[in-house]
């Protein structure tokens, strides 16, 4: 019966005799399909119809995502200054929905003048909560309220860690260098590992995606003393990407320590490679050439350099493979070169001019043959260096018998 009512409403609309009252009544139907259909009908006549704001406001809190979507669509056709604050309620208490998110995102942009200008003038959040402000500000690509939000963080007014992460992620995408500098300051002030991670992860994202640095980057060095591996790892990445030369001694000290965990050693190595320059090259040359440096640490240097310096790394890789303990590549040397086309070519060139023990050559051949790229040059070079015959890809009839 509800769907019959909906068809009658659509029929009156098609005949330019739209029954608005019937549509509003049907928008309160027990059937979600009928409610959504009624809102759709009201959407098309909204510019010529008064009193639809309460209908749309009720719809954006409906249990049905489809009804909420049409509620937001209806709001987009209305002239009320409250359309955006009402539309943002549609994302509360419901699972993530890309279509609904896009509809709310769009109305934040299309009705920007109804809320952004007021906020700039009054300096107050026009929405129900901070998350809504972050969403709306991201939609229009502006840093509205950023200073006020950072002040709230600094004053300890924001207690929820998830909200802190939301703010940090927003700053990563929208914040200015000055805002990022404040984030770094907040990271140094808090004792919460979760919040340190949130702030530092935002700084890392801003660097990688937007190439933006805060001021006072030397402050990151203090986190190289962190007992938390995650915090340490992000700090090491930032020290390298920000070119914080003052962190170099601390990084080298960790890499020189045989007791350092593989996780920290790898993070430090990548940081030093990111720092770059003659100092990094000299240090890594010394580390690789030192007879006291463990085989695993040398392998880490080679795999770490495979992308940045593939020719040098390939030359060193061959030396390590020739002396691999037990004739096995236990440290992923082959895999590191197979993951990069330029590095693969460099390794093929170096191996073609050398000899490899049969076990290590066989392992490399198996890895190269099973690689998605199946590099022919490397396969041929390994076969030659190890004195191996080409692997059979199929059996003859007699062999299958």
Regions found by a protein language model. Name each.
Residues 1-401:
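Long, ordered, helix-rich scaffold segments
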């Amino acid at each position: 019966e509800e769907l019959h009512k909906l068809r009658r409403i659509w029929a009156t609309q098609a005949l330019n005799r739209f029954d608005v009252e019937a549509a509003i009544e049907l928008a309160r139907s027990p059937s979600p399909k009928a409610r959504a259909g009624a809102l759709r009908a009201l959407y098309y006549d909204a510019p010529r119809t008064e009193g639809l704001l309460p209908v749309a406001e009720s719809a954006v809190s409906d249990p049905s995502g489809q009804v909420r979507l049409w509620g937001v669509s209806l709001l987009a056709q209305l002239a009320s200054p409250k359309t955006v604050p009402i539309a943002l309620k549609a994302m509360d208490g419901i699972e993530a929905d890309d279509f609904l998110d896009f509809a709310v995102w769009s109305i934040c942009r299309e009705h920007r003048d109804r809320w952004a200008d007021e906020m700039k003038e009054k300096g107050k959040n026009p929405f129900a909560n901070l998350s809504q402000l972050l969403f709306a500000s991201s939609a229009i690509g502006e840093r509205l309220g950023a200073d006020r939000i950072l002040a709230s963080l600094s004053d300890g007014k924001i207690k929820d860690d998830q909200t802190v992460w939301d703010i940090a992620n927003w700053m990563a995408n929208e914040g200015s260098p000055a805002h990022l500098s404040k984030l770094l300051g907040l990271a140094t002030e808090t004792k919460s590992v979760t919040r340190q991670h949130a702030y530092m992860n935002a700084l890392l994202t801003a660097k990688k995606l937007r190439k933006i640095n805060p001021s006072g980057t030397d402050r990151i060095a203090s986190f190289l003393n962190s007992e938390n591996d995650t915090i340490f790892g992000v700090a090491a990445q930032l020290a390298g990407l920000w070119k914080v030369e003052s962190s170099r001694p601390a990084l080298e000290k960790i890499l020189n320590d045989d007791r350092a965990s593989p996780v920290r050693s790898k993070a430090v190595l990548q940081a030093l490679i990111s720092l770059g320059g003659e100092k990094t090259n000299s240090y890594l040359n010394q580390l690789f050439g030192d007879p006291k440096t463990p085989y695993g640490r040398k392998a880490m240097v080679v795999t770490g350099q495979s992308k940045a310096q593939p020719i040098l790394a390939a030359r060193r890789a061959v030396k390590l493979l020739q002396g691999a303990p037990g004739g096995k590549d236990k440290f992923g040397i082959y895999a590191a070169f197979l993951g990069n086309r330029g590095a693969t070519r460099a390794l093929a060139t170096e191996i073609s001019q050398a000899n490899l023990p049969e076990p290590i050559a066989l392992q490399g051949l198996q890895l190269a043959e099973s690689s998605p790229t199946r590099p022919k040059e490397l396969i041929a070079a390994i076969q030659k260096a190890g004195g191996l015959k080409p692997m059979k890809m199929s059996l003859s009839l007699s062999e299958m018998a």
